[in-house]
């Protein structure tokens, strides 16, 4: 028998296998490229979320300082943003989906709106001085001083909301365009973690000083927001997009044709109407407590410092859950995550209505509210990206926000008026949250069954 000659060992190292790559449209990422993308996007989100966490509660405290009613607070903080979003969100998103330029289709809109939001936050910060100076200049009666300040505050808030709504209409679209679909749930988990860190920093260090030092808080965060988002836009690159769809035969040019196309795309299929309703009701369910939580804390004897610590504790819990919830959304799908969270939230809100009797019980239910709403906004964050058509994502997302805006326009003042009539009994905010969560859960079950019929997690394709 012939023995084959021994093969001498090779001195060359083994050839490594091909590195894994992720793709989002025409963009391709290695692990390092994906990490760089995440870092810049998360930096922009940190600036964004710090603005979102700071502006509403500080403005709420300013409104209370100048003796605004609950009705006016609901009008400012919920109905006004909804009214702006009702027409501006669809317009910006429709144009963004169809825009093609050297900077992409999302980044130009963010570069324009960020400085406007910064200026508006500075306007909010200086509203008391501007209002006082205007009142003195016009020689109005002393009794109208607070009203003058509130009007100036409202004008600055309106400009702020115009910029925020316009930016929000395209920020989610930017994520949809540059983040690979395979990791979108985990990406939103990290987004949520950054949001929570921003909330923890604000509520631990700043909320207790907001009544006396709202000027440096609002102006400083406004400058950080403008600079942070602009820097993100300069460092993140969009890919190439196919040309927008040509107008349909017989479609009228201009605004009328665009409105008809928008309405036909978004509202002609019952499936998407159920999706919009379920998402709007779910988000609206968190609004009653969110809108009046500062006033509720004071009415139940909770100081602003203790209130801030409850928020920080809830944010810390949500922070620990953020990445696991994002992984679960990738693994089990955002539709299932939304349904489970809403069911638990409805039960907790019922406990809040019947069980809150003082600061300790309010703090416990409020802690659960923040934690569970955070679970929803993390686990269901990618719901739109997973259900809407990819190339028309911003348009469909704005249609969902339009439905939410219609609810907010009426709900904010109605809830405030109800609380004014009920002697500011803020337990009713928990009852309203329970009812809306149950309605959102029912609509979500309809969506879930139709999603399964369209292929479910394995074979779903968004109908167009």
Predicted feature residues:
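Structural signature of the two symmetry-related core transmembrane helices
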Residues: 106-123, 336-351
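Multi-pass alpha-helical transporter architecture, strongest
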Residues: 124-131, 226-236, 431-464
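Juxtamembrane intracellular "pre-TM" segments in multi-pass secondary transporters
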Residues: 13-33, 242-275, 463-464
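A membrane-interface helix-boundary motif in multi-pass transporters
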Residues: 105-108, 141-143, 208-223, 417-437
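C-terminal transmembrane helical hairpin of 12-TM major facilitator-type secondary transporters
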Residues: 335-377
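Helix-loop boundary and gating motifs at the non-cytosolic
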Residues: 19-82, 271-278, 282-300
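Intracellular juxtamembrane helix-capping segments at the cytosolic ends
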Residues: 59, 166-179, 375-389
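Helix-to-loop junctions at the C-terminal end of transmembrane segments
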Residues: 87-103, 321-333, 419
